């Protein structure tokens, strides 16, 4: 399988996962997806380490064994955690420099012979056109490796710069370009504003509402996206995007049909209201397919530029995380969560607004969400028992139906304008962690005093 085919297969699989899971935080979901794929691949390679060594193949070019001062006993500090050659180490300012100032530039007597059958090489040095050299391994039979009798001298260890949280020895995959959300409020960036009719804005709003990337945008962000969309016309047979090119626009089809080709073979077609081109913008990866206008009368698309696309999605995610992290700190039932767990929970929450008299949950209905009250007040009532209690900011409801897979045990009604943060059933047990046990211990079902 070629690199392009491999990338296309990975991106197609990711697209299926995105459609199936419909995550609130798309960026976090995709990062977790590729991290889990990497972890699985590395685990499989590690299991083949002994067989590979027997065949003369070095899956992990590294220095696994460093001899102690006796020259015979092997130090096992890195035996299970081999030191990997970083493809970015020479130019990465975040690298950790694993050497002492008085270390020699090279390990004395280090073998000059390169591995003959390396599967993975660090040849992606940033800012360089020449591949970086693989790590040299110490020759255990070389007497020059014996440490000096001087106890002040440290054993010779080659320099190895490893970026923080770097996973080495695999092909590089998609990666998002660096953007710092903290600078958003201080820079001078302004989104483009195009002259659209009221009818066009309404139609585009409907289209964005059905797209998983923009579904959770607030009113202001959605307005910015709509006004930034520019109309582009293509004749029959025109290439809208080309496989392997850098992504510059995200497209929504207004009129006509677009055919998609991978390595010259047609793989799909899309019509009015469909969108394409988002993955290359999100992850700074090459276009996975070629899109060709396939209507005799031409194709009309709405296009969103790369910077606005990434800026809106990233800024929104960043601001939501900050807002929800502050809010979740004040929710007592979540006090057992770590800051990292709260951050993950914050990314999964979505906001819903209800007005006075609205029924947020109804007794007898199937429960699908767990709710935290951000602002406003609600009353909890049950058939035959009337109003049971009132809830306000920081209170929660909806847990009983999810904990016990039961219908809603009560009705929750908004007493004024209420803003709630919601968490779906799939994320309830996955993200609440130890808080689930606390919720179970407080389950009011047995006492018939349930609030949901």
UniProtKB/Swiss-Prot annotation:
Biased composition (Polar residues): 75-84
Cellular component GO terms held in the UniProt record: cAMP-dependent protein kinase complex; chromatin; cytosol; nucleus; plasma membrane
Keywords: cAMP, cAMP-binding, Nucleotide-binding, Phosphoprotein, Repeat
Residues annotated as transmembrane: none
Positions of 3',5'-cyclic AMP 2 binding: 399, 408
SMART domains: cNMP, RIIa
Record bears the keyword Phosphoprotein: yes
Residue spans of biased composition, Basic and acidic residues class: 95-106
Residues that hold a nucleoside 3',5'-cyclic phosphate 1 according to the record: 213-330
Any one GO molecular function term: protein kinase A catalytic subunit binding
Sequence positions bearing Phosphoserine: 173
Keyword DNA repair assigned: no
Binding site for a nucleoside 3',5'-cyclic phosphate 2: 333-451
GO BP term (any one): cellular response to nitrogen starvation
Subunit-structure text: Tetramer, composed of 2 regulatory (R) and 2 catalytic (C) subunits. In the presence of cAMP it dissociates into 2 active monomeric C subunits and an R dimer.
Family statement: Belongs to the cAMP-dependent kinase regulatory chain family.
Name of this protein: cAMP-dependent protein kinase regulatory subunit
């Amino acid at each position: 399988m070629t690199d392009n085919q491999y990338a296309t297969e990975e991106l197609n699989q990711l697209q299926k996962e995105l459609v199936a899971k419909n995550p609130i935080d798309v960026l976090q979901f995709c990062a977790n997806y590729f991290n889990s794929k990497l972890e699985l691949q590395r685990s499989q390679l590690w299991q083949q380490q002994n067989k590979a060594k027997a065949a003369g193949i070095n899956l992990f070019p590294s220095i696994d064994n460093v001899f102690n001062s006796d020259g015979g006993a092997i130090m096992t500090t890195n035996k299970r955690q081999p030191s990997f050659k970083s493809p970015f180490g020479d130019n990465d300012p975040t690298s950790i420099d694993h050497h002492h100032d008085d270390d020699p530039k090279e390990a004395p007597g280090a073998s000059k012979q390169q591995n003959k059958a390396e599967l993975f090489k660090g040849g992606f040095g940033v800012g360089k056109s020449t591949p970086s050299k693989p790590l040299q391994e110490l020759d255990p039979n070389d007497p020059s490796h014996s440490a000096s009798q001087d106890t002040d001298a440290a054993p010779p260890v080659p320099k190895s710069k490893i970026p923080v949280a770097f996973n080495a020895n695999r092909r590089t995959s998609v990666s998002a370009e660096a953007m710092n959300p903290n600078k958003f409020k201080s820079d001078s960036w302004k989104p483009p504003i195009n002259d659209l009719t009221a009818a066009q804005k309404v139609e585009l709003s409907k289209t964005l509402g059905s797209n998983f990337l923009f579904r959770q945008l607030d009113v202001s962000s959605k307005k910015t996206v709509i006004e930034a969309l520019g109309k582009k016309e293509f004749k029959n047979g025109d290439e809208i995007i080309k496989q392997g090119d850098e992504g510059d626009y995200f497209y929504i089809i207004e009129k006509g049909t677009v055919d998609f080709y991978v390595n010259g073979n047609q793989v799909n077609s899309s019509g009015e209201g469909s969108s394409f081109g988002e993955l290359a913008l999100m992850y700074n990866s090459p276009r996975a397919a070629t899109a060709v206008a396939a209507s005799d009368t031409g194709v009309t698309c709405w296009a969103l530029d790369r910077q606005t696309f990434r800026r809106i999605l990233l800024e929104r995610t960043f601001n939501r995380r900050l807002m929800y992290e502050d809010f979740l700190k004040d929710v007592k039932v979540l006090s057992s969560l770590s800051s990292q767990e709260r951050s993950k929970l914050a990314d999964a929450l979505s906001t819903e607004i209800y007005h006075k008299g609205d029924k947020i949950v109804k007794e007898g209905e199937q429960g699908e969400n767990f709710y935290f009250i951000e602002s406003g007040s609600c009353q909890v009532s049950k058939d035959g028992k009337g109003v049971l209690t009132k809830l306000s900011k920081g209170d929660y409801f909806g847990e009983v139906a999810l904990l016990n897979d039961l219908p809603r045990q009560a009705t929750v009604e908004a007493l004024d304008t209420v803003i709630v943060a919601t968490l779906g059933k799939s994320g309830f047990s996955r993200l609440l962690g130890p808080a689930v046990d606390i919720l179970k211990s407080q389950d009011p079902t047995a006492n018939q005093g349930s609030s949901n």
